[in-house]
Amino acid sequence: MSNSASPAVGRKLSWVTKLTYALLPLSFTMTTMVMTWQMIYYTQPLAISIGIVTTMLAVGKAIGGFITPIWGYISDRMYSTAFGRKVGRRKGTLLIAAPLNLIFYVLLWVPGMPVWYYLLVNIIYYGVYPGINTVVYSLPSEMTDDSKDRAQLVAVQQIGGGVGGFALSMFNAYLFKIWGADSWEPYFKIAMIYAVLGTVLLVIGALCIKERPYDETTDISSADKGSDEKVGFFGRLVSVFWNFLSVLRIKTFRNYLGIYLSQMTFRTVRGQINAYFIMFVLLLTPAEVSLSTGFSFLFGMVCVVIWATLITKLGGMRAYRLGSWFTIVLFVGIFILGLTHGSMPKATVTLVFTILITLFTLGNSGIVNAQTYVQSFVPDVDELVTGKRREGQYAGIQSTLEVIVNTVVTILVGVILQAVGFQSGADVKTQSPLVVNVLLYMYCGTVVVLALVGILLTYRMHLNEKTHDILVGESARLRNGGSMDDVTEETRKVVEDLAGMPYEKCWGHNNVINVSNKA
């Protein structure tokens, strides 16, 4: 049985395909608006207690996180439906998730509602949104096997996000200037603008993606069934969570996971309190928050091009280490600025911070691009282990972990700030010195410590361009009917090192997908 999805695997991707793929991360301006302004919107114009807001958001994200693995599971198995075989498994998932995301994104910003309303809407929103980012995360692996094309897709993804972030920051600065930032109306109007634009970009991007065709390796449902004719609801439920946990048996994924979590955590902490840091520590205005962020996004587009070139020359892990060391140096500088800004004119503080945060984009871009580049190779290890292409599985896990990290960070930030006496709705100059110091140490210290952790973990990661070529070659040999008995000694060693299990247990001779498989 065939499908109408546009296959790209096995040939070079055109730049038209790569640029239309950029529309998907460009649509993430909707999410950037939530991450940057939602907490401020709830605690400042709506004057809801920060303790209530952080608890509400944490619960919403946590419950949504339990739903997230289902999206990766569905996306991988969309070819088992007539709709999926007609439009494609990734494209079909996006076309289902996009309208749901629009509806609940709009409902997030409705003012004057009771707390239970915001809790419910946040739960549903954080349960729906992963249907989009699980697909976007999976596409570099889905669209091509070529390492250079994957590096370029990762770069295009980052540039798309950078363009969206810059446009949001500049546009927000302009709109806050003419509408003000003291009432709920400006936030609501801005959010509605991004709701429409983001959804249009998302749908157009979805219609243009390329993906793997329906064949033996993308027919995941056959592995789910095993010797059974049909998998029931309870069996599906068990399968979702078994697939979520069983990937930890794969050594490369475990190593990648530590690297991902370290950088994701420090970026989330910084993102959560970025506006508070600039407003309450540096005593700048909301417009200056957007402008500072905007400059970093603009410079980020240049940085992505630089890192895309460096990654192909240095490899993912060495590029990650370089970006991390650069980030550490810059945040030491930001820490010093936070301690000494009181003796500087406001214009000087704004200029110095803008320079430092813009330069941070160079380090952050290296970290994110290297991590995303390496992540695109993890499903190739999984294929050698399971005999199936499960890009959505790993994208779903990553989305779930993103929700979990956001949840934990949201709880901790709220608890810490409330414990030290943070005042919701207060003037920027009326926060206590303790609150200011806590924000300073959280903002800078978290980045420095976790960046060092990430550097140490990269030395445990053995998936590189050389071992990846060996891995992909072996998968292609087995896929084309080759015997596992004919494996070379070099290939066996590479496979066992990356998989973390004996070679004979690979290529589906395990229960990584199906817990009932006795092989």
Identify the residue ranges that each predicted region occupies:
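Membrane-embedded alpha-helical bundles of multi-pass transporters/translocases
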Residues: 2-518
